[in-house]
Amino acid sequence: AACTGRTSQSGTEEKPVITVTLEPQRYFTEAIAGDKYTVVSMVPKGSSPETYDPVPQQLVSLGDSKAYFRIGYIGFEQAWMDRLMNNAPHIQVFDTSKGIDLILNDNEHGNGYHDHEGHNHPGHSHAVEPHIWNSTANALILAGNTYKALCTLDKANELYYRNRYDSLYQRIQQTDSLIRQQLSLSLIHISEPTRR
């Protein structure tokens, strides 16, 4: 079960913690995990996931996490993932980007990392477009991987997670339909000749 067995100072049961890299992941994880977990993002809202360095308190707090959901190909993870896991080796790590078709980013001066003779450095990218959550197709994969990870962590609540995943899936599908509808209306409007 998701229970930690710990109680807070107020005497209530503390929820186990899942740490994610980014706020978009936090949205997916909270949408599916519901009230079973507390979800913490390593890169705070408004901070750059390419250049953010965690503060010491975050490294200490990471030790309280049951799992870490990584997104892959973000500068923060490339720079910090090994150190984070060395700091908290008991944490189960799940790659929520598994199965996503990545887009190569040939931006000469992108925000990513580029490997030159075996080393990475920021600010120069011929690598992967890291903003994988911006596609509804990818959002469905991220949500599916998050659902599977939660079921692995807490099999007893699989039906609860399934119901919440199904609800999120429908919201993403509705968003996709709305985007497609708006784009098709834009295309019709653009392609119609102006009449005088």
Regions flagged by a language model, labelled:
Residues 3-187, 191, 195:
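Extracytoplasmic metal-acquisition and chelation regions
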